[in-house]
């Protein structure tokens, strides 16, 4: 299994349900059409569909557009002809729409088949809004059917609805004041069930405040899609069209878009443009936090420093910006979640390669180039009511900047930053919450350099993935506090009169969980792009015991014996030396690739030399596969070439053989602290 999550859609036909599911996936596709298959021949497409992949269905749709016979597709793919006929019906509907632009009869047929306004607009060369107006003009509007959870055995009313284009509407609209909460959609790397935690708590708070609480979501794994959770549940795609249809029916007092992660917050501006009342942090505040120019101006006005950076719209602009800022630089596309396509580059050649191959860069899709500052990363989740700010806790991340915060071990309360730095962080958090205009939750990530200078990395004007962890660690239910603030109850009215409460005396540690052994092809090297698929928590009065518990809970094997395989980038060798020596002094056997082994031997550490694949041998891979290795330490220097390929092969081999893989020396340091604590006091844990 490779999937990290799933969506569910409900309709009256297979075609309708399938197309709703496709646009629920949030992969940038709104229909059974993927442009990457446009230039492939029928023969190439038939070869492609022999193997089951996540995008095979789009290749099959393209084959049907080319006129390929269903029986032939069935014989190649082994997909039942029943389903292929449904795909064929969708493709035939496309052709009918193209032949009858503007025809309301075919528009209704397309909507009953599950076509989105966006796709119909593309086929008719019209705007999505125009299709909506044509539908409204001809009365082509969805109705909502109730799921019968009792299979007609007896009458029941379960407030659990899906849309379809028929006649009778079964969703009875009440005259109560109501609030719609937008869910977070499918679980994927970068956006998990942490956001559903906030959604569910918000619904409970909305209900206790006397409102009718309505959820829109499409993920069957979540608590929010349990029909007993809210007053009404709409199981629909989180797209503007589908959400807007529900809003038109329910006429809510407001819509909350800041608790469902980036999925929900991306809907805020399109909904506002259609006259929807977005409550909590408004669209202007979201723009101030997420728009590069607006955010930089705000920071300058508040005298808050951030790493130098520029938004660039071409490759040459990117090269020029990096030369002005100075290498190394951190590059990433704007408006992403989970650090997708984010990298640290140290040379012009690597930057040019990144801008050519890793991202799409143009006027509409700028790429951010920032100075990379190596330092300690600190994170806060906070609540603002428009006049007051509350910071329940400050979290310190084990791994330095360069590792995505979602992949880093997180500690509350902080253990190695000074009171002066804490005061600065709290001051900046308060200024930013009020300056941006936050109403509800927000998250800030900071860098603290070796001179105790504090820089802002980013502000997320929404709930974050650390809200459940910090809520459990501090005892403050952040989602509840934030929801009451959104509904107009100030922090003092909630009994909160302080910026920062007294820290807990015990330590809470959040450790990431990875699925590298399942996700073949993914490099296990920790980087600015998030890769973890889960997390676990550990707590204890002693820091390293809390870390031990969190590591064990997250699936990390913590062994105080065995062999450590080491392969280091040249720039990491001096820093890694005392760490490897600590393993050696604890009785571990040390094995290393040639360059690393020679360095360690010169320093008096007995080391067995292993050759790499690029040297014509699989010694290092065979050693990892043999079953006696406890840890593999593998750091990375560059993003291409034989050394990089060797590193990928070593990391993949460790992951596939379920051996603890460490790519950050900060994680190695913490593991050694844990091993020393466990070895000395294991009986009391």
Regions found by a protein language model. Give the residues of each.
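Long amphipathic alpha-helical scaffold segments
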Residues: 128, 142-144
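Short alpha-helical "recognition helix" segments of helix-turn-helix
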Residues: 73, 120-121
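Acidic/histidine-enriched active-site and ligand-binding environments that engage anionic O-linkages
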Residues: 320-329
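ATP-dependent carboxylate activation and anion-phosphoryl transfer catalytic cores
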Residues: 1-106, 113-114, 137-138, 142, ...
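Hard-cation-handling environments
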Residues: 112, 116, 126
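ATP-binding N-terminal substructure of ATP-dependent carboxylate-amine bond-forming enzymes
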Residues: 133-136, 145-304, 313-320, 539-683
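Helix-turn-helix DNA-binding helix
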Residues: 84, 131-132
């Amino acid at each position: 299994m490779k999937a990290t999550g799933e969506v569910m859609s409900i309709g009256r036909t297979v075609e309708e349900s399938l197309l709703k599911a496709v646009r629920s996936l949030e992969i940038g596709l709104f229909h059974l059409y993927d442009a990457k298959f446009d230039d492939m021949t029928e023969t190439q497409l038939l070869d492609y569909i022999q193997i089951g992949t996540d995008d095979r269905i789009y290749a099959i749709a393209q084959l049907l557009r080319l006129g390929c016979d269903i029986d032939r597709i069935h014989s190649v793919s082994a997909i039942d002809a029943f389903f292929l006929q449904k795909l064929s019906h969708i493709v035939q509907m496309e052709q009918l729409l193209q032949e009858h632009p503007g025809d309301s009869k075919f528009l209704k047929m397309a909507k009953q088949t599950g076509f989105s306004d966006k796709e119909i607009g593309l086929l008719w060369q019209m705007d999505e809004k125009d299709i909506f107006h044509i539908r409204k003009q001809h009365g082509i509007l969805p109705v909502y059917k109730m799921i019968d959870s009792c299979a007609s055995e007896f009458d029941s009313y379960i407030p659990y609805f899906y849309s379809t284009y028929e006649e009778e509407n079964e969703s009875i609209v009440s005259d109560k004041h109501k609030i719609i909460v937008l869910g977070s959609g499918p679980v994927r790397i970068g956006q998990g069930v942490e956001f559903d935690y906030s959604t569910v708590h918000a619904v409970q708070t909305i209900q206790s405040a006397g409102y009718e609480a309505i959820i829109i979501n499409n993920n069957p794994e979540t608590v929010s899609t349990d029909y007993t959770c809210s007053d009404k549940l709409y199981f629909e795609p989180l797209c503007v069209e589908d959400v807007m249809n529900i809003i038109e029916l329910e006429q809510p007092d407001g819509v909350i878009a800041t608790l469902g992660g980036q999925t929900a917050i991306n809907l805020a501006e399109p909904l506002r443009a259609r006259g929807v009342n977005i409550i909590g942090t408004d669209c202007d505040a979201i723009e101030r936090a997420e728009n590069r120019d607006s955010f930089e101006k705000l920071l300058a006005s508040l005298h808050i420093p951030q790493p130098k950076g520029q938004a660039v719209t071409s490759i040459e602009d990117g090269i020029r910006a990096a030369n002005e800022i100075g290498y190394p630089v951190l590059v990433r596309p704007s408006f992403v979640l989970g650090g997708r396509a984010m990298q640290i580059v140290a040379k012009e050649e690597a930057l040019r390669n990144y801008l050519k191959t890793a991202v799409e860069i143009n006027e509409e899709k700028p790429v951010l180039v920032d100075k990379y500052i190596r330092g300690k990363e600190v994170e806060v989740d906070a609540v603002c009511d428009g006049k007051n700010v509350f910071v329940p806790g400050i979290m310190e991340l084990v791994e330095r900047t360069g590792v995505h915060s979602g992949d880093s071990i997180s500690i509350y309360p902080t253990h190695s930053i000074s009171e002066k730095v804490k005061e600065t962080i709290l001051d900046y958090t308060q200024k930013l919450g009020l300056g941006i205009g936050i109403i509800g939750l927000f998250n800030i990530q900071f860098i603290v350099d070796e001179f105790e200078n504090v820089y802002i990395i980013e502000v997320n004007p929404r709930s974050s993935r650390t809200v459940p962890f910090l809520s459990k660690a501090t005892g403050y239910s952040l989602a509840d506090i934030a929801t009451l603030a959104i509904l107009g109850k100030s922090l003092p009215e909630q009994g909160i009169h302080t910026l920062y409460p007294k820290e807990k005396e015990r330590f809470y540690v959040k450790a990431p969980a990875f699925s590298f052994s399942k996700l073949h092809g993914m490099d296990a090297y920790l980087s600015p792009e998030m890769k973890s698929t889960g997390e676990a928590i550990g707590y204890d009065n002693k820091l390293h015991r809390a870390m031990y518990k969190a590591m064990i809970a997250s699936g990390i094997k913590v062994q105080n014996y065995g062999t450590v395989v080491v392969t280091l980038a040249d720039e990491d060798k001096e820093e890694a030396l005392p760490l490897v020596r600590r393993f050696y002094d604890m009785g571990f056997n040390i094995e290393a690739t040639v360059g690393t082994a020679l360095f360690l031997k010169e320093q008096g550490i007995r080391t067995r030399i292993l050759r790499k694949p690029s040297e014509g041998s699989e010694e290092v891979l065979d050693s990892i596969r043999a079953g006696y290795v406890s840890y593999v330490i593998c750091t990375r220097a560059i993003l291409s070439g034989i050394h990089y390929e060797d590193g990928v092969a070593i990391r993949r081999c460790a992951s596939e053989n379920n051996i603890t893989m460490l790519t950050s020396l900060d994680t190695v340091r913490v593991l050694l602290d844990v091993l020393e604590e466990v070895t000395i006091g294991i009986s009391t844990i």
